[in-house]
Swiss-Prot record:
It comes from the Bacteria. Residues 128-137 have a biased composition (Basic and acidic residues). GO terms for biological process: translation. Belongs to the universal ribosomal protein uS9 family. It comes from Mycobacterium marinum (strain ATCC BAA-535 / M). The keyword Iron does not apply. Keywords: Ribonucleoprotein, Ribosomal protein. The lineage of its organism: Bacteria, Bacillati, Actinomycetota, Actinomycetes, Mycobacteriales. This is Small ribosomal subunit protein uS9.
Amino acid sequence: MTETTPEVEVAVEAEVTYSESFVFERPIQTVGRRKEAVVRVRLVPGSGKFDLNGRSLEAYFPNKVHQQLIKAPLVTVDRLESYDIFALLHGGGPSGQAGALRLGIARALIVANPEDRPALKKAGFLTRDPRATERKKYGLKKARKAPQYSKR
């Protein structure tokens, strides 16, 4: 009662590795938000150039902390010299815009190379920071600051 099934040789196609620079036919576009800032990011294969509202990274963000914050996702996945970044930033201040740009870059890197997702997720670059300014309440001077209290 033993039946023999014919064994079929299956040719395995070469697996596609994403470690080489991922080629895409058009720019990757993503959006990053933080506080009141909204940033639209375009990721293009290139040499690591930043174009933020027509200015360089150093001109737009003179603060080295903000520059480091923005480059962090690219450094994490070791693609600092692989892509050019064109971004339109509006709303908020420097800190909010830097955070929004970081989120937009991280989201674009995932679209470009899905294998980078675990590293970026672990580093916390894919989480939208929900903190925003608390509204002022009536009867108070600011969001939580009460007027001076006098016992007598």
